[in-house]
Amino acid sequence: MLNTITDFLGKVDNFVWGLPLIILILATGVFLTVRLRGLQIIRFPLAIRYMFSSDEEDGSGEVSSFAALCTALSATIGTGNIVGVATAIVSGGPGALFWMWMAAIVGTATKYAECLLAVKYRVVEKDGHIIGGPFYYIENGMGKQFRWLAKIFAVFGIMVGLFGIGTFTQINGITSAVGNFFDADIVHYINLFGRDYSITIVISGIILTVFVALVLIGGLKRISNVAQVVVPFMAIVYVLVVLIILGLNITKIPAALIEIVEGAFGLRAFGGGMFGAMIVAMQKGIARGIFSNEAGLGSAPIAAAAAQSKEEVRQGLISMLGTFIDTIIICTMTGLSIVITGAWDMGLEGVAVTTKAFQMGLPFPDKVAAFILMICLVFFAFTTILGWDYYSEKCLEYIIGNKPKAITAYRWIYIACIFIGPYMTVQAVWTIADICNGLMAIPNLIALIALSGVVVSETNSFFERGVHKQLK
């Protein structure tokens, strides 16, 4: 029965993530990059200045621009950076990392465009509550006749929250890391649903479910406040630890980069296998890249819409940094540590791959290395769970309106999915996540192409008015 379900999910995943979606994702990013004249590269220094600027705009919104970025990062920096990269390299080879880079480079323009549109088309309700995201720029930008497309996006957004990035993958990654540290050999186990599970996985799953249930009482400002403190801290800690691995293995990095590029184009395969190997590397790399940085997925615009910014371009520039931080920095470092240590080719899966890379690359006892990774993963994944509850609630609100009782009921369903996550296989949770992500991205990418003229017009107006020169 389990094999039948796994096979079915695999077929659906291959269908959703076929060449059409891969082309759509890359083509949208390239199209926007060309129309914006490489803005993500040329205006990158300005984006950095805006991110650290204390000169906040007095615009309508619920949180600061930096807080909106941190809210988005709290949802994007999660298991995708640690476990997702590992699963991509194990499934698609080292070349998958190359395609993650390509998707991120053009995806930065995609992230800029979607967050700009989110601020432009956001709605202020009578009580002053700010709502926005792809559903609003689809409806208000493309026209009321496309409200059906906005609703499809919202439905898929709920699916990603309940079954993808928001719950299953995060809790599964956390409990697996806890299990690897406390009971790697599953000495203490309990039989549930016909399978043996480590007691530590069961207990940690229950504890984390309870913690999430308690935290979800808060709203956006609470999530933003927590994110501003936790996200930068955990990112710095993780980067420093991986830098140690790369520093101690610096002589192996050139060979690893060659292996990544060769793997990206199937150069180590022969004959017709070259094309097949390249497609698999592209599929896994881009899919995990979307999972990790969420560029084009349509989630970051929901957070960006709440920013206290009257200039859409300013928020777009700040928000696009999320893709750079997430993929170009954090995912790259994880991927390189996995490739240079050879952990990807040892028959392991999921968090065990990254754990092995840490144990092989750090000058610490194995238990210490596993503990460091476990702590990082707990922080990464926990904030992602909170961020995606917010995203998926906004999707639900778009469909049914602001109904507190329905939202409360949804939160209980969300919590129930978190409770279930630890007992699913690594392959199942990541396959389901990929399927949901692909479906959610399609309507958003269509909207970005349709509204690209608006993005270009707003961008040109911003720089022609010299607004960027007013930055102190």
Task: Please describe what each predicted stretch is.
Residues 24-31, 36-48, 171-178, 199-249, ...:
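Membrane-interface loop-to-helix entry segments
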Residues 38-65, 87-89, 93-97, 101, ...:
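Flexible loop linkers connecting adjacent transmembrane helices
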Residues 58-91, 117-141, 152-155, 159, ...:
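Alpha-helical membrane segments and immediately flanking helix-loop junctions
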Residues 4-5, 35-40, 80-85, 161-174, ...:
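Transmembrane helix-loop junctions in multi-pass membrane proteins
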Residues 33, 114-122, 126, 242-259, ...:
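Extracellular/periplasmic helix-exit of transmembrane alpha-helices
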Residues 218, 225-228, 233-305, 356:
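Membrane-embedded translocation segments of transport machinery
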Residues 28, 32-33, 74, 103-128, ...:
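Helix-loop-helix module between adjacent transmembrane segments
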